[in-house]
Each structure stands twice: as structure tokens, then as C-alpha cells.
Amino acid sequence: MKKSFLLLPLSLVVLSACTSNFPAPISDADGNFSPSVIQSVNGSNVGGAWQPEIQKNSLPTTGNMVTPQQNFQPINQQPTMPTAPAQPAFQPSPKTVVSAPTVQTKTVTKTVADCVDGQHINIPRNPNTNAPDYSKISKGSYKGNTYKVNKGDTMFLIAYLAGIDVKELAALNNLSEPYNLSLGQVLKISNCDIKTVTTTVSVKQPAVTASTATPVKPAVTYTPGANGTQIGSDGTIIGPIKSEAGTSPSVPVATSSTQVTSSVNNANSTPINSNVVAPIASNVVWQWPTSGNIIQGFSSTDGGNKGIDISGSRGQAVKAAAAGRIVYAGNALRGYGNLIIIKHNDDFLSAYAHNDKILVADQQEVKAGQDIAKMGSSGTNTVKLHFEIRYKGKSVDPVRYLPRH
């Protein structure tokens, strides 16, 4: 009980010290006292409650803010470019077009007849008799394909203008003597120049598809085999093969993969001149009109031989070179002697001159190889046959149509 009374005064002293207006001194770790950092909010409010004053410091701005650096090691790595997703490889279907259509050119050479449908011509005439003045007319000056008969024209005049014989003109128009002409009548002349025309044309090649493309076969190589044979890489065997007794030797047959090239030496073959104009295609089957040697060949020059001369003996048979109809048989044309003209079709005529005797008549149908005359020397000084082939009224080389001996 005494202890309780003793402690009571001590407690009051402590309480009175805590409620004083002055803060208690604070001692630091060294035991030195220092005034308190807590100050009143308002100096006049001495009696108010004490609150600690929070000193406001402005935060640094973003620009002045120091960012702590992180410690890292740079990695040497090349930048990678973004790549597109891989596309699947294109595989063409069997019908897919592999190549586009192409255009190629090729050279075409053909023999054509250069004809003029009609031609206006002034014929110099005698003012008194209206007869043609041949001294002022050039033979063959008319180049038309047809001719319209004018007043005073004769068959001789028209043939002279066209540069052909009267009988040929009559044969072309199916006329017979005495050749009566009417004003305005149109005669077929067929005075065409035969020439070779070379042109270049474009050929469009179709597109090649996988389904239509033809695979290229590998080249066939050969190795020596037994008995002189050659064994091909494709299994074919060529060369001599010894046959067994009682059997026939097999004949090698060329397959599609083997190309057989043969060289034939013909002592009688005649070299072909590449500069000679190719013959015009003919549906007439020709044969030699007689046997013998050619003593004078064809010439296309002015004044040249318009056919071939074949030697022979008097009375030797002269035959029709092809089937046709006799359109002239006589000796009215000077320089030809006994002459026969055969019309084979609308394009081709053949002529047989200098005959000793004529065995056929005008308008007679003859067969190829039929005897039509006997060889002679009429109109010339030697026994021979002068033979001509005419295409559309123009002389062509008979040798290029006749079969080789």
C-alpha cells in the first residue's frame, strides 16, 4: 500500500511533462541533444495541436529526369527483312499452255502466168485502103490476154500483134478455115509471160501444250557387234548378218528412230541447173514423140529455138506426145513445113514440124503414142522433128516435161 502511494506522485510528474507546450529534447545516437524538427503549423496558434510540417519539394520534370541505365550487352545481329510467304512451285497441268503462239515466215516460190485482161492498141493503117501498115507495127507488141476484133482486122494481123502463129490463134479459139471474124468478137490470145514469183508469207505456229508436246527422242548411237553388225542404243541391229543354211538373209527394216541415207551414183543423170525456172505443173502425161538425139535445144531468148530438134531418119514414126485433139494439120505456116498441132487441154498445145507425111486429119482425136506423121525435112534442109510444147500460148522447154530417157 505504501508503494502505491509512492508511485502516484511520480506518475503525475511524467504526465505533466508530456503535456507541456515545449517539446522534449531529442538526443542523437551520441547522446547530444538537438532541437526538434517538428514546428507548429501556425506560430500564433500556440495553444493548438502540433502537426508536423511536410516540406514540399518539386519533382524533376521529365526532361530532367535521369533514367537509370540498364547494363546489357549489344548483340551483333543483322536486321532481317520481312519475307513474303513462300509460294508453292507451279506445276503445269497437261493442258496448260507452255509457250505462246509464234509467227514464222517461209519463202514460197511458184511459177505464174502474167496476163493482162485487155489492152487498147492503135493500129497504123493506110488512109486509103485501111490496110494495116506492118512497117509501123512491132510483132508481139500486143500483151493482152484477149483481143476484141475491130473493123479491118484479120487473123494474120491479130496473130502478128500477139506474136503467135495463125494456127495457134485458131486452135486457142476453136476456129477453122476460112476464119470468119465478126466485129466485136473477143478472141483468146493467152499472151502471158511465164515468170517465177518468190514471196514470203507468215505462218502462225499454234501454242504448244504439255499434252501435245512431242518428247524429243535421244539420238541413236551404234557400237560394233559381231559379224560386222552395228548395235544401236535403241536395240536395233544394222549391217550384214550371216544367215543360217536354208534360210533367207533378213533385210534390215528402217524404223522410225533410224534414218537411212543412200547415195546413188547415176552416170546418165543430168545435173539440174538451179537457175532454170521450174516447170509449170501439168496434168498432161507426156512422152517422147520420137526416138533420137537432141541436136538443138530450147532457147527462151528473142529469135531462139522455141522447141527442141530431134534427129532421125526419113520415114521414122512421129507419135503424139500426149492424148488430145488435132487442131491443125497442114503446111500453110512458112518455116514449119508439114505441121501438126495437138490441143491437149485449155492450157497446153504441142507442135510437130518438118514432117514428110501427115497421117491424121483436122479435129481428129488421138491417143498418146499414136502415129501421127512420118519424119522428114519439109521446110528445112535436114531430116529432123521440130517439137514444141506451149503453155497458154507461150513456148516452154519440152525437156522439162518429157520423161528422162
Curated annotation (Swiss-Prot):
Lipidation feature positions (N-palmitoyl cysteine): C18
Composition skew (Low complexity), residue ranges: 81-94
Keyword Transmembrane annotated: no
Keyword tags: Cell outer membrane, Lipoprotein, Membrane, Palmitate, Signal, Virulence
Keyword Iron: no
PROSITE patterns xref list: LYSM (PS51782), PROKAR_LIPOPROTEIN (PS51257)
Renumbered residue ranges of the record's region Disordered: 81-102
Disulfide bonding pattern of the chain: none
GO terms assigned for molecular function: metalloendopeptidase activity
Record's signal peptide: 1-17
Classification via InterPro entries: Cell_wall_metabolism_enzyme (IPR050570), Dup_hybrid_motif (IPR011055), LysM_dom (IPR018392), LysM_dom_sf (IPR036779), Peptidase_M23 (IPR016047)
Main location: membrane
Function: May be a virulence determinant.
Family (UniProt): Belongs to the E.coli NlpD/Haemophilus LppB family.
Protein name: Outer membrane antigenic lipoprotein B
Annotated organism of origin: Haemophilus influenzae (strain ATCC 51907 / DSM 11121 / KW20 / Rd)
